[in-house]
Amino acid sequence: MAHFTLYSHAGGPNPWKVVLALKELNLSYEQIFYDFQKGEQKCKEHLALNPNGRVPTLVDHKNNDYTIWESDAILIYLADKYDTDRKISLSFDDPEYYKLIQYLFFQASGQGVIWGQAGWFNFFHHEPVVSAVTRYRNEIKRVLGVLEDILKDRDYLVANKYTIADLSFIPWNYNLGGLFGEGKFSFKEEVPQLDFEKEFPKAYAWNQRLLARPAVKATFEELAKAKEQH
């Protein structure tokens, strides 16, 4: 039996943060994929584990089936419980520990929410709303500008090393091309475009460093297979 069960979705970025951490820490897991079109994530069995009815939800079978949801909370749990060598995290007494937590909150409230809304209005909304697409694309650029400033004199967000703070940004940034692509609608009006490398070179270089990690490559290979199968 795998150490963890991860309730997931083949396309949603947030569960794949958890996969990244599990792979970085060499922890075994089984993924159960829900079909959002059928509303499977709202089934009674899943709501009993996660009353919010969203993914990811993680069950730790080696800790009395301890269950936790919210992707960045899961990252903290995995780091505190299983990253004893602090490969991708920091110890509680490290002066940068709360900076790490800070960036996880920034990812959740700054990147995740905005990228998600941009995706909704680009791919799923029932009608084109140019003002919404413009707003969220501009907000993406604002957040990338914040990261650009943070990374102007460092390679990673915290303590000059790769941590779950960096990891948390990877899956949503992986979708940047699609968020600025044509999507569901063709707009007659001009909407913001993005040249990531040219406009935000420090953030782009950071993202490329993250994508080069073996665990990240393996995660996106698994993601591609999951999309084919689900």
UniProtKB/Swiss-Prot annotation:
Involved in the oxidative stress response and detoxification. Keywords: Transferase. GO terms for biological process: cellular detoxification. One of its GO terms (cellular component) is cytosol. Induction: By O-dinitrobenzene. Its EC number is 2.5.1.18. Residues 2-86 form the GST N-terminal domain. Belongs to the GST superfamily. It catalyses: RX + glutathione = an S-substituted glutathione + a halide anion + H(+). The keyword Transferase applies. It is an enzyme of class 2 (transferase). CDD domains: GST_C_Ure2p, GST_N_Ure2p_like. It comes from the Eukaryota. One of its GO terms (molecular function) is glutathione transferase activity. PANTHER family: GLUTATHIONE S-TRANSFERASE-RELATED, TRANSCRIPTIONAL REGULATOR URE2. Residues 93-230 form the GST C-terminal domain. The keyword Iron does not apply. The gene is gst2. PROSITE patterns: GST_CTER, GST_NTER. This is Glutathione S-transferase 2.
